[in-house]
Amino acid sequence: MQSAWANPILLLVLTTLIWAGHSIVGRLAVDQIGPMTLTCLRWGIALIPILLTARPALRRDWPVLRTHWRYMAAMGALGYTGFNALFYVAAHRTSALNLSIIQGAIPALVLIGARLFLGARFTALQGLGALTTMAGVVAIAAQGDLNRLAALAFNGGDVMMFIAAILYAGYTIGLRERPHVSGLSLLAGMALAAFITSVPLMIWEIAAGGFIWPTAAGYATLVYVALGPAFVSQIMFMRGVELIGPGRAGVFVNLVPAFGAIMAVVILGEPFAAYHVVALILVVSGIAIAQRGSGGGRH
């Protein structure tokens, strides 16, 4: 266990596998548990191990967190509640393959958002990478059909997933203004905010008649998303960044759409069309080009 905890490659590959598996589980959750119920209970359950793990750090950082409660609430609502709620609704309307590939656009959206709203400069390679990635998303949305693109006749689930990606990109940009606290304290604060802000969504789902009492598969899904993407992967990613730095650790995001596509085909038996091949190549290549343009591990 000690050697595994000191192996950044293993930790980061496992992290990306968990993230990729999120798309698969999102599809498996359809008709097994309501999307807003899944979002709310995910953070409610995840809070338990997160708070237990972060307790020493929270004692130290609590005065700072308390003065930044508005920031914590906004970030939890945007990056955790908003992203997850849209993600799970999108999973009802599109394939896990599309969910995985569209998620791959998040790094490009971060670059674009930082340029538009913060005036951040990026290199020619980063710009090329962002454009290449977005071309992959367009290929998915149009399903390889130029007529569909011209008519703007996109799948609603793909559009929702893209909006979710925009929200998460906004959350990522917002992390630049994070208070000076430990990563664990930040995770705990935003997870608490996510749970609180997702409760009204679950109440709305119940009131609107959309509540689905979880099946056995629904409970299994809930356990996976609460302990996997919401907790274990976050801890492993923090450790990976600690060992090799954020620049080199960021390269591993390339694996998420690739792993997700493979899982969607192998586990769910989803069809892998020619436009999926083109989109996957464009998205992964775009991420790699942008990463190279950022100077890799120097940042």
Question: What positions do the PLM features span?
Answer:
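Glycine-/small-residue-enriched transmembrane alpha-helix faces in small-molecule transporters
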Residues: M1-C40, R148-E177, T197, R298-H299
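Specific transmembrane alpha-helical segments of multi-pass solute transporters/efflux pumps
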Residues: L17-V25, L51-Q103, A139, A226-I244
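Hydrophobic/small/kink-forming positions within alpha-helical transmembrane segments
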Residues: A20, I24, G76-T81, A85, ...
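Membrane-interface helix termini and inter-helical loops of multi-pass transporters
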Residues: I24-Q32, V89-H92, A141-F154, I203-A217, ...
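Specific alpha-helical transmembrane segments that line the substrate/conduction pathway
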Residues: T37-I48, L78, N84-R121, L125-G127, ...
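Helix-helix packing/entry segments at the starts of transmembrane helices
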Residues: T39-L41, Y80, N98-A105, I173-I196, ...
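Hydrophobic transmembrane alpha-helices of multi-pass small-molecule transport proteins
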Residues: I50, G113, F122-G144, S198, ...
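Transmembrane alpha-helical segments that form core, pore/gating elements
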Residues: I50, V110-I112, L116, L146-A208, ...
